[in-house]
Amino acid sequence: MRLSVIIPAYNEEKNIKATLDDIYDYLSKKHVDHEIIVVVDGAKDRTAEVVSEAIKMIPTLKLIDIKENHGKGYVVRRGMLAAQGELRLFTDADNATTIDNLERLLPFIQQGYDVVIGSIGLPGKEGKAGSEPAYRILFGKLGNLFLRIFIISGIHDTQRGFKLFTAKAATAIFPHQKINRWAFDVELLVLARKLGFKIKEVSIKWANNSETSKIKASDYPKFLLRCLKIRWDLVTGKYDLVN
């Protein structure tokens, strides 16, 4: 079964090569048939050039270089729909969740789940390393509670950049995705559930990197408003969903 690893990248020239080496080395040693797709989101640094150079050493690596910035959700969608794998994982360019965490997700695909998401929010589980600013901890907890009550019940952490989809789920969900920036993860999960796909949340190890985080305190109200719009669009039939 072929695996596609999609990596959205914006101004990641300092991190991307080490992440690519780690992913390729791991999958090669495990003899996993795979492709690695980096989708550059209008980066202002040398991210695309670094990936182009890495292709010489990593034969399974592909680059989609988008010249204008559209947002993480947009480039994840581009990568997912360009992928050829029966399984499709998106993961962050800073390697906050290392590829070996895939071993935690795969058993649930074998059990029949269609979407398996990495989480550091499950009760009784501790998967986070590194400190976060106090505002992110507070807003994160309040935001997750809000989401469970009003948007998508039963999911404790929607925001980890480590999500695995079957090809069937990916090709059904991503064409309906409207949100290109923050909150696209929530939209994907809402769409997956509405389309009848089985979702499993699994504890993973995640290392916070404050230097690579692009989230500001002012982003949280926008995030919540976008989530409310997802619910509104779903209720009013603006998503034309047919599984």
Residue ranges and their predicted role:
Residues M1, L145, F150-S153, H176-N243:
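Hydrophobic helical membrane-anchoring modules
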Residues H34-I37, A48-A82:
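Conserved donor nucleotide-binding strand/loop of the catalytic core
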Residues V40-E49, N95:
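A conserved acidic beta->alpha catalytic loop
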